[in-house]
């Protein structure tokens, strides 16, 4: 038994094997023919030899491993029919590609081969094994192949011949023509076959060959034009898709920026709201309105008086000039030990409020303290003085020390 495979089928399988990242498998399509060789020697002795030749014309690759059998090596006929379809009768074998393995059939492959032989009904089913071997430094790559015909006892190796790859002698070429499966080619031959072939299939005229050639070229050019148009359409569609993708990405970026800006504004507003005081600013410790009513009752007894630096004479002058003395606020003058703790009035106004208008600390004083405080208060403030003289006197006279530094000038509540 001998076997041969067409050049383009062998090159296609080798190309697929070299460029694949994993193992793959498929089916071999072709036919099996018988050759009879009759030889006569010089001694008038004739010898007849019959040779069975397996011709592989095409192949049908599978999409992945385990496509027509399961992990238990059981062949599924439905999957097999779905892969082969109408080519089931042309199957003469199957092939498999493995990397860096020995060129021997595995037990799984032997089990699958027996099932395929029974299901397909081909007794001479063959198995073609491809293996790709490379050296350690990847300097040499070798693609090895071997054809098996499994028997009951052992796996018989069959020599595989590839036409047009050896010597260019006539013996290396195939005797029978390879069937062409192209529909366009069959259509052209059907139209122009009667012009240069007789009924017996003998060529009539060589001129008809050129006509067929021109017709084929026209078909090819038409197909090329259609392919070019379709490629242009695909390019334009791809450009539109890329443009839409860029627009979508840009809109997403804009929305993300807006969201970040809103978050930044919210984060800025939250600290500002947290820093705002929860209560209104307090008024000055003591003072009088334009009508002369005291606001001592409105202040809390525990609030300390503001520093004297806030009521510096220069500051008072600027305040009086701008506000036209509509709202004048003065702090009590520093007083000696034992003096009254009543606040002095500005603009010639005297304190005429009742005891309810005093601070709780001031109203807690005894009767004797009140009498001495009234005398001291009259000595310090002269009713005959005009508001302007008092203002000038307060401007020229300046306390030497801060009330916080001199314990003699501090205000004490009488208990």
Swiss-Prot record:
Keywords: Cell cycle, Cell division, Coiled coil, Cytoplasm, Cytoskeleton, Microtubule, Mitosis, Nucleus, Phosphoprotein, Ubl conjugation pathway. It comes from the Eukaryota. Residues 249-323, 336-415 are annotated as: Disordered. The keyword Ubl conjugation does not apply. GO terms for molecular function: microtubule binding; polyubiquitin modification-dependent protein binding. Residues 368-379 have a biased composition (Acidic residues). GO terms for cellular component: BRISC complex; cytoplasm; microtubule; nucleus; spindle pole. InterPro entries: BRISC_Abraxas2, FAM175, MPN. It is found in: Cytoplasm; Nucleus; Cytoplasm, Cytoskeleton, Spindle pole; Cytoplasm, Cytoskeleton. Residues 220-241 are annotated as: Important for interaction with BBRC36 and other subunits of the BRISC complex. Residues 312-322, 337-347 have a biased composition (Polar residues). Detected in heart (at protein level). Residues 215-266 form a coiled coil. Component of the BRISC complex, at least composed of ABRAXAS2, BRCC3/BRCC36, BABAM2 and BABAM1/NBA1. Interacts with BRCC3/BRCC36; the interaction is direct. Interacts with BABAM1. Does not interact with BRCA1. Interacts with SHMT1 and SHMT2; the interaction is direct. Identified in a complex with SHMT2 and the other subunits of the BRISC complex. The BRISC complex binds monoubiquitin and both 'Lys-48'- and 'Lys-63'-linked polyubiquitin. Identified in complexes with IFNAR1, IFNAR2 and SHMT2. Interacts with THAP5. Interacts with ATF4. Component of the BRISC complex, a multiprotein complex that specifically cleaves 'Lys-63'-linked polyubiquitin, leaving the last ubiquitin chain attached to its substrates. May act as a central scaffold protein that assembles the various components of the BRISC complex and retains them in the cytoplasm. Plays a role in regulating the onset of apoptosis via its role in modulating 'Lys-63'-linked ubiquitination of target proteins. Required for normal mitotic spindle assembly and microtubule attachment to kinetochores via its role in deubiquitinating NUMA1. Belongs to the FAM175 family. Abro1 subfamily. This is BRISC complex subunit Abraxas 2. The gene is Abraxas2.
């Amino acid at each position: 038994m001998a076997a041969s495979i067409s050049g383009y089928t062998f090159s296609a399988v080798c190309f697929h094997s070299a460029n694949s990242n994993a193992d793959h498998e498929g089916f071999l399509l072709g036919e099996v023919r018988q050759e009879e060789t009759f030889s006569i020697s010089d001694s008038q002795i004739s010898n007849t030899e019959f040779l069975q030749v397996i011709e592989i014309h095409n192949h049908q690759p599978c999409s992945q491993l385990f496509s027509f059998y399961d992990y238990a090596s059981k062949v599924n006929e439905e999957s097999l029919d779905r892969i082969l379809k109408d080519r089931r009768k042309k199957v003469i074998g199957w092939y498999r590609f493995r990397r860096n393995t020995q060129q021997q059939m595995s037990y799984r492959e032997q089990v699958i081969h027996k099932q395929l032989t029974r299901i397909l009904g081909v007794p001479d089913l063959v198995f073609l094994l491809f293996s790709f071997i490379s050296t350690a430094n990847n300097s040499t790559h070798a693609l090895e192949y071997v054809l098996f015909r499994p028997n009951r006892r052992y796996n018989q190796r069959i020599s595989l011949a590839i036409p047009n790859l050896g010597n260019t002698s006539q013996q290396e070429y195939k005797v029978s023509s390879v069937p062409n499966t192209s529909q366009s080619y069959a259509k052209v031959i059907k139209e122009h076959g009667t012009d240069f072939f007789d009924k017996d299939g003998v060529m009539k005229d060589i001129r008809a060959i050129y006509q067929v050639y021109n017709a084929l070229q026209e078909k090819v050019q038409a197909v090329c034009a259609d392919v070019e148009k379709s490629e242009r359409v695909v390019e334009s569609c791809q450009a539109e898709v890329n443009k839409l993708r860029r627009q979508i990405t840009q809109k997403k970026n804009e929305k993300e920026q807006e969201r970040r800006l809103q978050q930044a504004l919210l984060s800025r507003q939250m600290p500002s709201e947290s820093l705002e005081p929860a209560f209104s600013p307090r008024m000055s410790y003591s003072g009088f309105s334009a009508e002369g009513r005291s606001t001592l009752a409105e202040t809390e007894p525990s609030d300390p008086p503001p520093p004297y630096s806030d009521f510096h004479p220069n500051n008072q002058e600027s305040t009086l000039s701008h506000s036209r003395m509509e709202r004048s606020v003065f702090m009590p003058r520093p007083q000696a030990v034992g003096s009254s703790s009543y606040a002095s009035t500005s603009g010639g106004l005297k304190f005429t409020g009742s005891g309810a208008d005093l601070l709780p600390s001031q109203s807690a004083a005894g009767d004797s303290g009140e009498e001495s405080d009234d005398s001291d208060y009259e000595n310090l403030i002269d009713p005959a003085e005009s508001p302007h003289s008092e203002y000038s006197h307060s401007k020229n006279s300046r306390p030497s020390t801060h009330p916080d530094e001199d314990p003699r000038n501090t205000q004490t509540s009488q208990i």
